[in-house]
Amino acid sequence: MRTVLTILLLAGSALSMSPSAQGRPAWLDPYRDNADKLIKAATADQFAWDRVAELTDTYGQRISGSDNLNRAIAWAVETMKKDGLENVHTERVMVPKWVRGAESLEITNPPHHVVPMLGLGGSIATPPAGIEAEVLVVGSGDELTKRAAEAKGKIVLFNVPYTNYGETVAYRSGGARMAAQHGAVAMLVRAVGPIGLRTPHTGNMNYGDDTVAKIPAAAIPVEDTLRIQRLTNRGIKVRLRLKMEAHFAPDVESLNVVGEIRGSEHPGEIVLIGCHFDSWDVGTGASDDGVGCIVGWEAARLMKQLSIRPKRTVRVVLFTNEENGMRGGNGYRDQHAEDAPNHIMAFESDSGVFAPARLAFTGSDAARKIVAEIGTLLAPLGLQEIGPGGGGADIGPIAMLGKVPMMSYSGDPTKYFTIHHTPADTVDRIEPAEVSKAAASIAAMIYVVADMPQALPK
């Protein structure tokens, strides 16, 4: 209790100091020079963007269990060592290996028309000859329930307009189970994204328990969904033929990649920077989450380059298997359970870097005040405002276990979710300056949190 009180008193004392001459908190004065150096170094060139391009151009899609991901992991280990990061190593986890296989969808009535589609991660296959059936278009789960008698033997298509990802993704993840409960033979979902470019969006789905039959599940573009809706509105019985070879192979070994800048005074206290290194198998995973990995990694690389060693350890973890299993984040929690309380803060970037970007924080009021004041150092980047809701899927497990404050860096959601889980998630969509800005803000924030005398209060 005495230690906790001491931390809180130190935090309160720091925050109550009089403002500096520049109108910024005086307690930050010792950190301004190094924070400015990190920001200037990060924004001096497009090194970070070039590294995202190297990763995604060279290794492409990186779905769990793939050779591409394994090669990318080996590259990351070698490159972290070349960067001078310390304690570079890998940590083993077993991950699912879902294989897409060949797939196709076509309208057979009215006259033949090929529909772009992507099977959803975790889906089963169709029979070898495919499934041909009439389609039932519904706009919600409630409508499906009301029209349950019509669903038996049909392919159910959820035409649910995008509102936000958290709401609309429920039909991608749970739509197959909803449709199967009413006797459907397959489920299709309108692409989960704000803008249609005739691009389907893949993503994980979940059958739940074994009380309901498993049926094939896929996503189709907004435009094709609307076309089928219009046809059915005219009383036309639209028939579709779906073929999918999707299946699970046995679980395989994968690796989380770890690199550090060891703390000068409190090496056992950890400021964690996380991201996921895997991606879906249809794009190159540039925004989801190649760029998130590189901008976090840059924080440590820049500290090493500038000979800045904070008091606490800065640990970068490139997590495996976020997209279709969360085995990387959960494995890290399990392997570091004893050290969970020693994690001072966990940071994640997994929502792109498209402008306008934002920083967000989740933690105690006392910690929030400190982080908000550190944010004043980011004024040159336009990121001084720290919003609520920081966190991430990969850092969540260790943060929940250790009651660890969380932060995140997020890009514009409309731009991000337009290409999310699509073949269009490529590095050319990203502006180099936006990558540099993200790296700069993360580096400066992490440096101060890792170097200030008191740990963030929990």
Predicted regions and their residues:
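N-terminal capping segment at the start of a domain
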Residues: 26-66, 199-202, 278, 349-354, ...
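His/Asp/Glu-rich mid-to-C-terminal helical/loop segments that flank catalytic regions of hydrolases
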Residues: 301, 305, 312, 417-458
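Metal-dependent peptidase/peptidase-like ectodomains
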Residues: 113-114, 128, 133, 215-220, ...
